């Protein structure tokens, strides 16, 4: 599953006005929430068609039930193993007489008894069963075996089981089949078998689609819903005759009319390979497609709304899919396992994308690309998300993790090799370099907290769906990607690929744990006689079984290296023990005065080597191209030499390492390892820098300063400094783009141009402010002809709305409502949060929970856009505090990301009062709980304490530095 805005100018503290508006927002949004809750209450699952006294449901909490009973535990017992399923589903795309959208289905599961048992436990969620002889299922033997009679069946809601109690025991090694007929709601909750809606002209269209990961296949049909319970699936869909049915495999033949109703067709699909339930997909829609046959014979199709396909929005995805599939087939030394690769863009989809085997589902903005209206960053997102999902077709689908505690291996691997696949499809973009900014530094911000967690968690600690959901975080995706990139680097890509191919060949159609990969990589190392300080397993266990990462400190006067666990707050209490005592086996790469040196391994807390000692004006720099997952600190003299080199000729240092110098120093300053002025001094050379990565590293690092100080007197001098530094970059792009009429050829230059405009406008460069307001005014005068290049729209929209008022906001809102391309709608939706008008933000916040105005899948990100605006943060925080219980109860199982919301709304917290509010918020809502936001709340408390300390220590010196250096 794939991972995946601009902030307006500050207005300072608005005091009483903010409080009054927040109360208004609370009242307005409470009404919206009540409406949504009532709608949800009226949309509960349909009643059983044949109710019976013996068909009981157990609603008690699993924590209060007898844990000695297998059905009260979240993990399936090992007594039964599924072999195959026959599933028929019929979604109704118009509401019934109760106003509900429903689907009906039947299922036959064949399973083998591995241990004698008198109970069948299978997952089932929100399904209502048709009773047969008083029971929800019919059981029969296969191959002459005789099944015991059924005593009773029950639904255990807390653990989401259908439990079949038997009067005798199933026989070990015997096969059985179990039939059921059921009905469920085709809800708009973005989970399991659900419905998505969109407008085609003035007509509302409905799509039946799926999202099974992690634990929602059970919401579509009864199944053994764990990744290790692989089986073959025979899917049949009954659907309106004018619609198309899709699933993981191709149809066996043309659809045939349903005998009892010719308005319906029956589509039967070929049997799937042995696979996990979470990778199943089935879709009924009137979508259209474009297709081509790959050189290896695989059928490639891109599906989307007919108007999007007709406009050519699927063409780019079609053109890159074949090359990416071929790349991974070569990279894995394994042919693509299926006869076709369907990819479909859905109007409503909670994740960025989902790697369903042979039928990958996407948000529209992750698959569709319009060259006339989409930006280069939109194009980059499409190619990288496609590469991520196609990487999973082998790593994750063909070979699958045993249990979700190793999710990081699935998602971390795909998050790493997505850059390789995308780079193959777009070789001139240098996409592999972006991983440092997008993943390595992104996750280090979280992994430097005492509340972080290791990549690999013991299986016994991950049981409930909520615990599984918490694993889909930056650690699993981005740290997983970062340490695998480091592993590939010190092994060499060829050795890494050899071990990977062996792993895939050995475990095809099976399940693994992470140690299996280490063992196969070790075999490849042994075959190549590569010298490592110890085994792959020993090295990687340090990076996967303990949280965090080291900071390597270099004393160039002696050549001494030392390592310690890097914590943003060095006084924080690390309560999680580590068998390795937070010592890592670290691959060290380095350059001296621009010349690369031999590689080195730091295996102890401290070591000495002449590679790292200098004399005269020599400087040394560690972690070449940031292939290692660690930060680097130097003695004061070496820092001074690096700064001198940057200001004299920054090109002597590789561009990625120029970004590293900035990012490491700011984080070291946050951790009290270096003075904050040292980190700020590392940005002085930017007045001469034109490359994207160093500037992005600086802006990203300084965004923390903005969060801490945009409500204080520091912010004025800070803006003046940024204005001074960015003006040459702004002028450079103005002159080299014919006064913004042309776009730079190089992708990184295009991104740098956007940074130049965004930074110049938000920090008061008059020419920039005039440019964006002029372009936006031209568009307002002629709405049918947008003069703003797609690359520049996000920043122009945001800054123009920030400078404007109600007229500009209402125009942008109207354009958003009429946008037919999701990428354009996304740009406008984010920019609408840039307003300086409190009442406008208040109104916009009230829109976010009306799905007729803001799609459910976009509600969280829209609220986050508002809270990222200094003016809107108070509105959102007041609302979250006052309405958490309602928010959690109404949306806890749906499309809200509580983790992202908590992280965003607390990002500016830096006062004792805000800490007290946060602690009170936790106390007040302990009974309600925080779901997927539980860990985020603990991290928010830790970050707030660190912020308070940092501001107290640094405010005055930062104010002085910006004042002196902005002249």
From Swiss-Prot:
- Enumerate the residues marked as the site Transition state stabilizer: 477
Q: What induces it?
A: Estradiol and IL8/interleukin-8 decrease enzymatic activity in vitro in endometrial stromal cells by 40% and 30%, respectively.
Q: In which tissues is it expressed?
A: Expressed in epithelial cells of the kidney, intestine, and respiratory tract; granulocytes, monocytes, fibroblasts, endothelial cells, cerebral pericytes at the blood-brain barrier, synaptic membranes of cells in the CNS. Also expressed in endometrial stromal cells, but not in the endometrial glandular cells. Found in the vasculature of tissues that undergo angiogenesis and in malignant gliomas and lymph node metastases from multiple tumor types but not in blood vessels of normal tissues. A soluble form has been found in plasma.
**Taxonomy, superkingdom:** Eukaryota
Q: How is the cofactor bound?
A: Binds 1 zinc ion per subunit.
- Name the InterPro entries for this protein: Aminopeptidase_N-like_N, Aminopeptidase_N-like_N_sf, ERAP1-like_C_dom, M1_APN-typ, Peptidase_M1, Peptidase_M1_aminopeptidases, Peptidase_M1_dom, Peptidase_M4/M1_CTD_sf
* EC number annotated for this UniProt entry: 3.4.11.2
Family annotation (Gene3D superfamilies)? 1.25.50.20, 2.60.40.1910, Neutral Protease Domain 2, tricorn interacting facor f3 domain
Q: Where are the transmembrane segments?
A: 9-32
Q: List, alphabetically, the GO terms of the cellular component aspect.
A: cytoplasm; endoplasmic reticulum-Golgi intermediate compartment; external side of plasma membrane; extracellular exosome; extracellular space; lysosomal membrane; plasma membrane; secretory granule membrane
Subcellular location field? Cell membrane
PANTHER family noted in UniProt: AMINOPEPTIDASE N (PTHR11533:SF172), PROTEASE M1 ZINC METALLOPROTEASE (PTHR11533)
Family, similarity comment: Belongs to the peptidase M1 family.
Also noted in the record is: Found to serve as a receptor for tumor-homing peptides, more specifically NGR peptides. It could serve thus as a target for delivering drugs into tumors. Concentration in human hepatic bile, varies from 17.3 to 57.6 micrograms/ml.
What this protein is called in its record is Aminopeptidase N
Q: Which organism is it from?
A: Homo sapiens
Primary gene name: ANPEP
């Amino acid at each position: 599953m794939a991972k995946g805005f601009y902030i307006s100018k500050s207005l300072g503290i608005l005091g009483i006005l903010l409080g009054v508006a927040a109360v208004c927002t609370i009242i307005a949004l409470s009404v919206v929430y009540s409406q949504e809750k009532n709608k949800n209450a009226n949309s509960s699952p349909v009643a059983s068609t044949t109710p019976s006294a013996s068909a009981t449901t157990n609603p008690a909490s699993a924590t209060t039930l007898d844990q000695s009973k297998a059905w009260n535990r979240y993990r399936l017992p090992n007594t039964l193993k599924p072999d195959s399923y026959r599933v028929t589903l019929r979604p109704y795309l118009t509401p019934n007489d109760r106003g509900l959208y429903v689907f009906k289905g039947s299922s036959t599961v064949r399973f083998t008894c591995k241990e004698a048992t008198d109970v069948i436990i299978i997952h089932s969620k929100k399904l209502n069963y048709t009773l047969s002889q008083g029971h929800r299922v019919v059981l029969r033997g296969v191959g002459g075996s005789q099944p015991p009679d059924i005593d009773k069946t029950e639904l255990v809601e807390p653990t989401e089981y259908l439990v079949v109690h038997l009067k005798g025991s199933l026989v070990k090694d015997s096969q059985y089949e179990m039939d059921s007929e059921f009905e469920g709601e085709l809800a708009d909750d973005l989970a399991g078998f659900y419905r998505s809606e969109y407008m085609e002209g003035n007509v509302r269209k409905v799509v039946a689609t799926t999202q099974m990961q992690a634990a929602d296949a059970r919401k579509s049909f009864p199944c053994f819903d764990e990744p290790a319970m692989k089986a073959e699936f025979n899917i049949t869909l009954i659907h309106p005759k004018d619609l198309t049915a899709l699933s993981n495999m191709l149809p066996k033949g043309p659809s045939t009319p349903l005998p009892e109703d010719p308005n319906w067709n029956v589509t039967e699909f070929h049997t799937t390979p042995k696979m996990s339930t979470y990778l199943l997909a089935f879709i009924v829609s009137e979508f259209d497609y474009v297709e081509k046959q790959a050189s290896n014979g695989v059928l490639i199709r891109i599906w989307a709304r007919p108007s999007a396909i007709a406009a050519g929005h699927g063409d780019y995805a079609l053109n890159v899919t074949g090359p990416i599939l071929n790349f991974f087939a070569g990279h894995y030394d394994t042919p693509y396992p299926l006869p076709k690769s369907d990819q479909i863009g859905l109007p409503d989809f909670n994740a960025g994308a989902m790697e369903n085997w042979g039928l990958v589902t996407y948000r529209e903005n992750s698959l569709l690309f319009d060259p006339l209206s989409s930006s280069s960053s939109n194009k980059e997102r499409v190619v990288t998300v496609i590469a991520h999902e196609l990487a999973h077709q082998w790593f994750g689908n063909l070979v699958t993790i045993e249990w979700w505690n190793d999710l990081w291996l699935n998602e971390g691997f795909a998050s790493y090799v997505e850059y390789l696949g995308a780079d193959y499809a777009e070789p001139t973009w240098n996409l592999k370099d972006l991983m440092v900014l997008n993943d390595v530094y992104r996750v280090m911000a979280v992994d430097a907290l005492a509340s972080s967690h290791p990549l690999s968690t013991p299986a016994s600690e991950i049981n409930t769906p909520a615990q599984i959901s918490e694993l889909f975080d930056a650690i699993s995706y981005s740290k997983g990607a970062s340490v695998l990139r480091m592993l590939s680097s010190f092994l060499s890509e060829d050795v890494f690929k050899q071990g990977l191919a062996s792993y895939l060949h050995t475990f095809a159609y099976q399940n693994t744990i992470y140690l299996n990969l280490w063992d196969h990589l070790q075999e490849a190392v042994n075959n190549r006689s590569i010298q490592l300080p110890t085994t792959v397993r020993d090295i990687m266990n340090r990076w996967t079984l303990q949280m965090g990462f080291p900071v390597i400190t270099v004393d160039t006067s002696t050549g001494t290296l030392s390592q310690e666990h890097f914590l943003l707050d060095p006084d924080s209490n690390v309560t999680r023990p580590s068998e390795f005592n937070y010592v890592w086996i670290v691959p060290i790469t380095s350059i001296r005065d621009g010349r690369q040196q031999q590689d080195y391994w730091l295996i102890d807390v401290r070591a000495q080597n002449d590679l790292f000692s200098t004399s005269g004006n020599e400087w040394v720099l560690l972690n070449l191209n940031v292939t290692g997952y660690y930060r680097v600190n130097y003695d004061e003299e070496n820092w001074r030499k690096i700064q001198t080199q940057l200001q004299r000729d920054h090109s002597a240092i590789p561009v990625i390492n120029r970004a590293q110098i900035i990012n490491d120093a700011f984080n070291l300053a946050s951790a009290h390892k270096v003075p904050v002025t040292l980190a700020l001094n590392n940005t002085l050379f930017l007045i001469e820098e034109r490359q994207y990565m160093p500037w992005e590293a600086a802006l990203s690092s300084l965004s923390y300063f903005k969060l801490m100080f945009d409500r204080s007197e520091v912010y004025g001098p800070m803006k003046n400094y940024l204005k001074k530094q960015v003006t040459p970059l702004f002028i450079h792009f103005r002159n080299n783009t014919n006064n913004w009429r042309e776009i730079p050829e190089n992708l990184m230059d295009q991104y740098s141009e956007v940074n130049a405009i965004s930074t110049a406008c938000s920090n008061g460069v008059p020419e920039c402010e005039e440019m964006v307001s002029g372009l936006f005014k031209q568009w307002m005068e002629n709405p049918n002809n947008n003069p703003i290049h797609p690359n520049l729209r996000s920043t122009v929209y945001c800054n123009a709305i920030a400078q404007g008022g109600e007229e500009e906001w209402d125009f942008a809102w109207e354009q958003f409502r009429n946008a037919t391309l999701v990428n354009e709608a996304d740009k406008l939706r984010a920019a609408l949060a840039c307003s300086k008008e409190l009442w406008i933000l208040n109104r916009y916040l009230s829109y976010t929970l009306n799905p007729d105005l803001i799609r459910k899948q976009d509600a969280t990100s829209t609220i986050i856009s508002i809270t990222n605006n200094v003016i809107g943060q108070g509105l959102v925080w007041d609302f979250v505090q006052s309405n958490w219980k309602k928010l959690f109860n109404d949306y806890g199982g749906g499309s809200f990301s509580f983790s992202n919301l908590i992280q965003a709304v607390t990002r500016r917290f830096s006062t004792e009062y805000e800490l007290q509010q946060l602690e009170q918020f936790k106390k007040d809502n302990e009974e309600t709980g925080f779901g997927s936001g539980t860990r985020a709340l603990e991290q928010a408390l830790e970050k707030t304490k660190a912020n308070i300390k940092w501001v107290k220590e640094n405010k005055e010196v930062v104010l002085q530095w910006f004042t002196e250096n902005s002249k």
